[in-house]
Amino acid sequence: MATEIDINRIQKDIFIEHKGEPYRVLDYEHVKPGKGQAFVRVKAKNMLTGNVTELTFKASDRIPLADFEQVYATYSYNDGENYYFMNTQTYDMIAVPKEKIEEEAKFLKEGMEVIVFLYKGQPIGIELPKHVELQVVETEPAFKGDTQAGGTKPAKLETGAVIQVPFFVKEGDIVKVDTRTGSYVERVKEAK
């Protein structure tokens, strides 16, 4: 039997099981209506299908935690269908289907350390580091007058991802990106 927790102790990024399927909690809200019973609204990602859904639980409910295994691994390569990661403990290769990590794949770089999630022995997703440093390979040059506060332009990164960056960023710069939001954090190194 899986470990259960009181719904009032729910937190972001924990894994729960609902109707026999694993979910990752993305956000939650305790709701206390003027009339009626309090409840908890949970925004969660189904780790098997990738769908994000809203679940509602009574404040008195207990929910089972999903039985996940977390494996520390290093990204090696992809063959178009799967992304391959090397388990840093056993050196075994783990193949994760591309549809399981479409969002995360935009920021994957060879040699990057990640966590691979296994559910009943099957890989169902990964967790990237919170921030990654990637090189800008394509962006429009800055022009005189492009100095308005908060102005941004699109930039293509070495992994193929396109993000919005400030006007002063140019090709060859190394930028720090927040992998959770896909947004620019700062310029780490300026191109020479």
Curated annotation (Swiss-Prot):
One Gene Ontology cellular component: cytoplasm
CDD domains in the cross-refs: S1_EF-P_repeat_1, S1_EF-P_repeat_2
SUPFAM superfamilies: Nucleic acid-binding proteins (SSF50249), Translation proteins SH3-like domain (SSF50104)
Pathway recorded for this protein: Protein biosynthesis; polypeptide chain elongation
Entry annotated with the keyword Cell inner membrane: no
GO aspect biological process, one term: peptide biosynthetic process
Protein localization: Cytoplasm
Molecular function terms from GO: translation elongation factor activity
Keywords, alphabetical: Cytoplasm, Elongation factor, Protein biosynthesis
Taxonomic superkingdom: Bacteria
Cited NCBIfam families: efp, PRK00529.1
Role, per record: Involved in peptide bond synthesis. Stimulates efficient translation and peptide-bond synthesis on native or reconstituted 70S ribosomes in vitro. Probably functions indirectly by altering the affinity of the ribosome for aminoacyl-tRNA, thus increasing their reactivity as acceptors for peptidyl transferase.
Similarity comment: family membership: Belongs to the elongation factor P family.
Name the UniProt record assigns to this protein: Elongation factor P
The organism of origin for this protein: Aquifex aeolicus (strain VF5)
Gene transcribed to yield this protein: efp
